[in-house]
Amino acid sequence: MPTFLNGDITTPGHLVDPDPRESFADIPEVWDYPDFLDVQLKTFHDFVQDDVPPADREDVGLQAVFNEHFPIKDNRDRYTLEFVNYELDAPKHTVEECIAQGLTYSIPLKATLRLTSKEEEGGEEAIEAIEQEVYLGTLPFMTDRGTFIVNGAERVIVSQLHRSPGAFFEKEIHSNGTELFSARVIPFRGSWMEFSTDVRDVLWAYVDRKKKVPVTTLLRALGFSSDEEIVKMFDLADAVDIGDEDEFEEHLGRELATSVTIEKTIEIVDEDTGEVVDEEMEREVLLPAEHELEEGDWEELDEYDVSRLYLVREDVEDEALDKSTLVETLQKDSSHTEEEALEVIYEKLRGSEAPDLDSAREALERLFFNEDRYDLGDVGRHRMNARLDVDVDTDEKVLTKEDVVGIVRELIRLQNGESTADDIDHLSNRRVKSVGEQLGSQFSLGLARMARTIKERMNLRDADKFTPKDLVNARTIESVINTFFGTNQLSQFMDQTNALAEMTHKRRMSALGPGGLTRERAGFEVRDVHHTHYGRLCPIETPEGPNIGLMLSLCVHSTINDFGFLETPYRVVEDGRVTDRVEYLSAEEEDQATVAQANAPIGDDGHFERDEVRCRHQGDFPIVEPEEVDYMDVAPNQIVSPSASLVPFLSHNDANRALMGSNMQRQGVPLLRSDSPIVGTGLEGRVAKDSRSCVVAEGEGVVEYVDAERLVVRYDEEQDKTDLTFGEPVQEYELTKFRRTNQGTCMNQKPIVQAGDRVEEGEVLTDGFAMEKGELALGKNVLCAFMPWHGYNYEDAIVISERLVADDVYTSVHIEEFEHEVRDTKRGEEELTREIPNVSEEATKDLDERGIVRVGAEITPGDIIVGKITPKGETDPTPEEKLLRAIFGDKAGDVKDASLKAKPGMEGGVVIDTRLFSRRELDPASKKMEEKRLENIESDHERKLADLNERFWEKFFALVEDATSAGLEDREGEVLLTEGADFEEDAFDEVDPSDLSTRAEFTEDEELNDQISTLLRNYKSRRRDIEGTTKRQKHQVEMGDELPSGVVQMAKVYVARKKKIEVGDKMAGRHGNKGVIAKIAPVEDMPFLDDGTPVDLVLNPLGVPSRMNLGQIYETLLGWAGDRLGVKYATPIFDGASLEDVGDELEKAGLPRDGKVQLYDGRTGEPFDEKTTVGQIYMMKLEHLVEDKMHARSIGPYSLITQQPLGGKAQFGGQRLGEMEVWALYAYGASNTLQEMLTFKSDDVEGRSEAYESIVKGENLPSPGVPESFNVLVRELQGLGLEVTLD
């Protein structure tokens, strides 16, 4: 039986109650969804730490980037530039202003830098420090919707899935069948180090991807100089003492693991005198490694006093492994000491001999052991420690000897079959690089460039006095950041067709982009669904086409942890009992766990009802006893994204169709009147709310005023004065009205509450675009029949009723933006006007005095939208001429029409808004108005500030009423209160709250101090908002509108068009059931029910069996029951209505249980032979509208080289007559038509103009000439050196 999902809402006075949905869910909701936009908002605010006072900022994000690059010193250590803190100012413009004027929504970034200079005066060192605030440029700031506005367009920074830093082990099979193993260390920043075995079992190390050296050479260079040390460290050999010959003979026949070397003294003798000039130690190999001990070896060993040997271990069972890789490698190693090893590596790196030992050691250390050049990051160190089972301090961000030894040890274990290679597609090896981190790396790039120029300037300025401002060039950082937002592959123009498309774009994960994969290189494995995607990345929602599997979507419950790995929540199971505790697990942690499904039956006491529970463990699905279960899924829809979660009966659809269904919901055009689906999944409200396309109540309160454009809510004020916030009790919300989205659809908010209503925190107050009663509404519920209809619905085509057109059921509003600039040209300034030369009065009737079309005017193709004249004339006018023209206003003779006109296909447009942006004017009248407006802004600012200060002191004294002072000073160090004094109001008469420090000890009570600090922080935040608003208003008055250089004025006109549904438009349901409208039939011709109701839509039943998307049938039947009963349903995926439930609802509605009824032919009135499945289906109109695709060329542009018409609608191009079309004309023997097509109608330049002339004169067409493409071919051949002439 369905239950009510939201409880019975009976609040009186609501304009429209959000109807509760009857839910079929059996599994209770135990864990709430995270905010769906956290993936953007949280990471950005963690990066900028905008709500944290400078002194309290953690060493992450922007703060960490500054700390990484500062201090900067000159070469002689005389000057040091240190970073103190950074400040973020309020944005100069609002989001709306930026969108309207084509600006970037950004905040000014300022840093306080300290320049310390050391100078020697009279033998003593004098230190001078200058601290200064320096402007570092503007930083694009994220809006509260999780987007960036760059040059007026909303953009999204997509998160990137890339390979995590750390050590990775791989295995491959050589063509001869040998198993080859390799390891790779990938840092965040710095050179890669690689290791690999070859077919002879030698282990090589690749340093900085250059030439290879035996791994033992690298180990020696790191300090493990002797063979004995190396084999002992890896426990590869038995150390055997041979004190006498008997002990030696015990080991005869065994192999040496290391070579036996001796040191000999060689005398260097002068040939002329015979004197010994010098002595040199030389190392000589007595017995090589892998040598089998023989009886004759004892004498040599005894002679040189060798008492210990390292022999290959006997306890290795497998004969193939009796020689260790390392023993083979030692054979290849030409070095024997640390010094020799360092020299070998230096030679490989630099291609020349090392000048000295220190240089050789420094070359290696700079690559992997220097913090400035190498950084594993927190993630890399965490992964290294976990994978290699080493215990290196987490603050150590460079490679260590333990790491290298750990990697070699792991490679030996791999070769011995004791360990397994890494799966590169496992989500423990892939991490998310979110917005904040991407911005951080760009910022780091900009700061590194800036640091270089600062250093250069320091070195150049010797005796000059200079300040931090003289050293810093703000444009350096700004240009890097702007390039990132403008050109980076992950900075994308936001898909804004509807609220779901917007939200999905922000939650997208891309494997492409800088440092990621490319479409061409990505194979099947990396695109495939992996078992670690469960609950983290959606297995359904991914694009079709070349990006399949590379662009993924976050699951509903998925979050990103501090290391950037994806986590998903699970309920903890203890001793077979499911607890209410929830833990987030990363893919690595989950590998150790056994996880039960969300639908496993549980008793009232939390124990599993069955003795055997089906679970997941890594990639398997074992059936285990309840005691062995560690965790349980929190929800059945945990494995999919919000988009796939909105598809009811998803479990009855084939995965390919489910993919199409979830993708096509994003293409649904917001309709004039949207309906939320009768059959939903219960997630519609949450998606609509989290998409931020509606206004949500910030607390409990009462709606004071409502109209179509604004909404005023009075929130309940806390009765006690100890409330630490400064929220305004009365909030006014300006509603978004008919705003154009990125895709040209219409964004419009309308209130769903009435004046006098009580609202609660989180309650939806307005509908956004594609919303109804606070729920997502992408389409319409229509009565549908599954049957063929006179062949019109063949192959997925759709037949619809004329009612859907006449009643505007699928009518949508689309908005186009027209922009026209007025420039200052060499010949004089252009001008907006309605007085245009050689244009009739009729053509300018809708233009106002500025030459801009009036709001409400209807636009047809060719109409003037913005009237503009531009000066013409061969010569520039002299000042006298300019004066005479200004006096007599004679413009007609020397100006030409440069008006903006409506393009073809613009029928039915209505002007809904016009804007004119102008530079600041400086005439006396304007100046006077400006001064008055500035005065008003200033007085308004002072009033708001005084009110805020009063509220602060009121709350402050309420907190410290019974407390005594711990000794209080202001920021300048001046004593305000002595220790033990009471907090008297008189003592603070002259004190401004902003002078108090958030870190001061106000009282002896720690808890009270924290409360005061919070109050002070909230005060400063509110004050910053007020000052930012004032600054913005003043800037607007003083500077006028910001326009590009050379532009004097810019006019923008917004034209709205209603698009009714028509033949050729694409429609789709939520189950991948898409089709194109082939016929709009009269209502009277449509099949009708017993009671005479005609159906709205006829779908082909053959579209169901082969596509295997039965969800549409379930939805149709349940929708019909809901329509009859006046109920809306929630059928969550994997926990929804069964066939039995659907049948029950149909019976309750008085409909046949199987949903099949007798239909009658509208044309004849005769009953059809068979009963037909009928019901209410939810269908959307997609943005692939035929009107946007229809195109016909008259005269348009030609390609310069081939002289053929261009292709495509955007270029106003022609239709290509391709190879196959030419064959068709051959086949019909239409030689004249073919010749015409290839000459006059294409690229016979002379023939074209002659044909035009003859048509005009009414003469016969001339003979065709030579097509230009033939001339191009001739020139190509001539370019190859072949002489081709045409006789």
Curated annotation (Swiss-Prot):
The lineage of its organism: Bacteria, Pseudomonadati, Rhodothermota, Rhodothermia, Rhodothermales. The gene is rpoB. It catalyses: RNA(n) + a ribonucleoside 5'-triphosphate = RNA(n+1) + diphosphate. Belongs to the RNA polymerase beta chain family. One of its GO terms (cellular component) is DNA-directed RNA polymerase complex. The keyword Transferase applies. Its EC number is 2.7.7.6. One of its GO terms (molecular function) is ribonucleoside binding. Keywords: DNA-directed RNA polymerase, Nucleotidyltransferase, Transcription, Transferase. Transmembrane segments: none annotated. One of its GO terms (biological process) is DNA-templated transcription. It comes from Salinibacter ruber (strain DSM 13855 / M31). Pfam families: RNA_pol_Rpb2_1 (PF04563), RNA_pol_Rpb2_2 (PF04561), RNA_pol_Rpb2_3 (PF04565), RNA_pol_Rpb2_45 (PF10385), RNA_pol_Rpb2_6 (PF00562), RNA_pol_Rpb2_7 (PF04560). DNA-dependent RNA polymerase catalyzes the transcription of DNA into RNA using the four ribonucleoside triphosphates as substrates. The keyword Transcription applies. The RNAP catalytic core consists of 2 alpha, 1 beta, 1 beta' and 1 omega subunit. When a sigma factor is associated with the core the holoenzyme is formed, which can initiate transcription. This is DNA-directed RNA polymerase subunit beta. PANTHER family: DNA-DIRECTED RNA POLYMERASE I SUBUNIT 2. InterPro entries: DNA-dir_RNA_pol_bsu_ext_1_sf (IPR042107), DNA-dir_RNA_pol_bsu_external_1 (IPR019462), DNA-dir_RNA_pol_su2 (IPR015712), DNA-dir_RNAP_su2_dom (IPR007120), DNA-dir_RNAP_su2_hyb_sf (IPR037033), RNA_pol_bsu_bac (IPR010243), RNA_pol_bsu_CS (IPR007121), RNA_pol_bsu_protrusion (IPR007644).
